[in-house]
């Protein structure tokens, strides 16, 4: 292998020759390195030579770059060693994301992704938008925020929020659905996973009216959510049947895995609220997505900056192991 200098390296990290190599400032050293399933990922948009060397300089230690590749407009870099708290903090300060490699399911083996819906698969909390149109928006939004932070019992808080809708016109549901903003990256993520033989489902503490719409639009494998009771075109203020709470979500993941004969090691769960934590912990890979502080603290893997294609960036690490 001829000597490689920092100046020889192109701006596009995925085109770097001589990987694996050690990067320390302007010093570049090709290595004979075989890491197996160990190491960690650093990824983000615009992660070029300059940003990577700036990151390494702040880290204050040499980085062993095992592989680099692109996932659509994201650059993904696989690094040797252990992901430290300092490396994580500096990545977030640089608007980049990280993930340890150890428990990543294999992308080319059939798997299962179970997503939360509100503020994960879509950009809004549906109950808040319904309540705005019903005239109880401010009160309901405050309760929703506290429930997602884990400060309130989810079931009791959901029932209290739904009760404020009593007597409101159920056509509100259609109004909200007509303007339902999908989370960036959702459609691409679902299409890519389904092409690879994965099952994708939603387990939501929100409502069936929206979850079933997403199921049909994206051809999802399954959805579970809460059903609002409607009589004579009006909300009764009640929810029909069992509440989809934190434990229900976790049981949905394990049930679907059993139903489709998918090992738990090949499952992924993603969500943003405290009621997603049991599901996140039950999965082979649990991801907190733009989550509340309590959820970020308790999840081993978080996505702070990327959109939902960040999930695919993480899973792509299973394809780039030497």
UniProtKB/Swiss-Prot annotation:
What is the annotated signal peptide range for this record? Answer: none
Query: Gene Ontology cellular component?
Result: cytoplasm
Active site, per annotation: 116 (nucleophile), 118 (proton donor)
Metabolic or biological pathway, per its Swiss-Prot or TrEMBL entry? Amino-acid biosynthesis; L-serine biosynthesis; L-serine from 3-phospho-D-glycerate: step 3/3
What residues bind substrate, as annotated?
A: 10-12, 125, 161, 204-205, 249, 275
Q: Which UniProt keywords apply?
A: Amino-acid biosynthesis, Hydrolase, Magnesium, Metal-binding, Serine biosynthesis
**Which Enzyme Commission number(s) are listed?**
3.1.3.3
Q: What is a single molecular function from GO for this protein?
A: L-phosphoserine phosphatase activity
Any one Pfam family match given in the protein's UniProt record, by short name: HAD
Q: Which InterPro entries match?
A: HAD-like_SerB, HAD-like_sf, HAD_sf, PSP, SerB_N
> Known catalysed reaction(s)?
O-phospho-L-serine + H2O = L-serine + phosphate; O-phospho-D-serine + H2O = D-serine + phosphate
Sequence positions that bind Mg(2+): 12, 116, 118, 272
Q: How is the cofactor bound?
A: Binds 1 Mg(2+) ion per subunit. Can also use other divalent metal cations as Mn(2+), Co(2+) and Zn(2+).
* Variation of activity with pH: Optimum pH is between 6 and 7.5.
Q: Name one GO biological process term.
A: amino acid biosynthetic process
Per the entry, which co-factors are needed?
A: Mg(2+); Mn(2+); Co(2+); Zn(2+)
Q: What class of enzyme is it?
A: hydrolase
What function is annotated for this protein? Catalyzes the dephosphorylation of phosphoserine (P-Ser). Also catalyzes the hydrolysis of phosphothreonine (P-Thr).
NCBIfam families per record: HAD-SF-IB, PRK11133.1, serB
Instruction: Tell me its family.
Output: Belongs to the HAD-like hydrolase superfamily. SerB family.
What protein name is recorded for this chain?
A: Phosphoserine phosphatase
Q: Which organism is it from?
A: Escherichia coli (strain K12)
